[in-house]
């Protein structure tokens, strides 16, 4: 008797489910008539649920930390930090990676400070890079919106938020009080940009500067320019800090680069709060080989015994710098290690990210 009741109960639930599905389908038809096809979809029947495409950062250790193999497409990214910490270098390296894959990038230079010679040294094809040097913040963000709506741009870099000066401020007197103008400009623009980004699959990066909040006695007095809107709308926020200078071997005064630390303070596409250290050489950009060495050591493809590094039974060299230089010369070996590492890392991340998503749902 109990089994019969249970069976009848399941039939009733099933019929209710069918009625609900029919009602939703009628609503969907009406919604699509009003707002257009694709206004209401099931995630499983669309590209939304099929993973997030990414743009490589140019460093395998940073790609690993980001969780999906690079910067997510269709999202807003903020890169912030003190002056000369490597923020622009990170974005130019991303542009170079996009162009290597046949993509198109644009650089909105609100600071009017882009150095094409340096960009070219980092691997950017400057002859194919779209450049805008706007006069006002409104102009910069409207240009970004038009580029996103075009659907033809893969990556947009805005340098920087602090330089996006509202027109009212430019037209006004030096002594005029213009409280909150930039914050309102950013909030209004980001509301418009967010909705169209995912449809165009464009990634937009905002470089930002650090400001000090006056009167803060406890806690961190640092904040970023442009108000809170960018913090909220960003899917990814990277804090970049210079931690030490790199000098030429045998010299304490001949500085050839910087070591920087990148902390992922916000990540909506993978677990956040990861930290990585990157090497940036002046005139060359991020050291891809140093990243490969660090990742290979972490995943046991390369072994270290004392000061010696070896790959299987083959010794690569003594000392970190000599091995990085060796990988720089042996391009085929470096490429092979990069491919093997990406296979190891991102096969592992698949399951980790699934667990992370389940944890968030719980």
Swiss-Prot record:
Q: Which family does it belong to?
A: Belongs to the RecA family.
- Which species is this record about? Borrelia garinii subsp. bavariensis (strain ATCC BAA-2496 / DSM 23469 / PBi)
Would you kindly state one Gene Ontology biological process term found in this protein's UniProt entry?
Answer: SOS response
CDD domains with a match to the protein in the record: RecA
Q: Which Gene3D superfamilies match?
A: P-loop containing nucleotide triphosphate hydrolases (3.40.50.300)
Q: Does the keyword Transmembrane apply?
A: no
Write down the HAMAP family for this protein, in alphabetical order.
Answer: RecA
- Name the major location: cytoplasm
Q: Which UniProt keywords apply?
A: ATP-binding, Cytoplasm, DNA damage, DNA recombination, DNA repair, DNA-binding, Nucleotide-binding, SOS response
Q: Name one Pfam family in it.
A: RecA
Q: What is this protein called?
A: Protein RecA
User: What does the UniProt function comment say about this protein?
Assistant: Can catalyze the hydrolysis of ATP in the presence of single-stranded DNA, the ATP-dependent uptake of single-stranded DNA by duplex DNA, and the ATP-dependent hybridization of homologous single-stranded DNAs. It interacts with LexA causing its activation and leading to its autocatalytic cleavage.
Q: Which InterPro entries match?
A: AAA+_ATPase, DNA_recomb/repair_RecA, DNA_recomb/repair_RecA_CS, P-loop_NTPase, RecA-like_C, RecA-like_N, RecA_ATP-bd, RecA_C_sf
GO MF term set: ATP binding; ATP hydrolysis activity; ATP-dependent DNA damage sensor activity; damaged DNA binding; single-stranded DNA binding
Q: Where does ATP bind?
A: 81-88
Tell me which GO cellular component terms the UniProt record holds. cytosol
- Annotated compartments: Cytoplasm
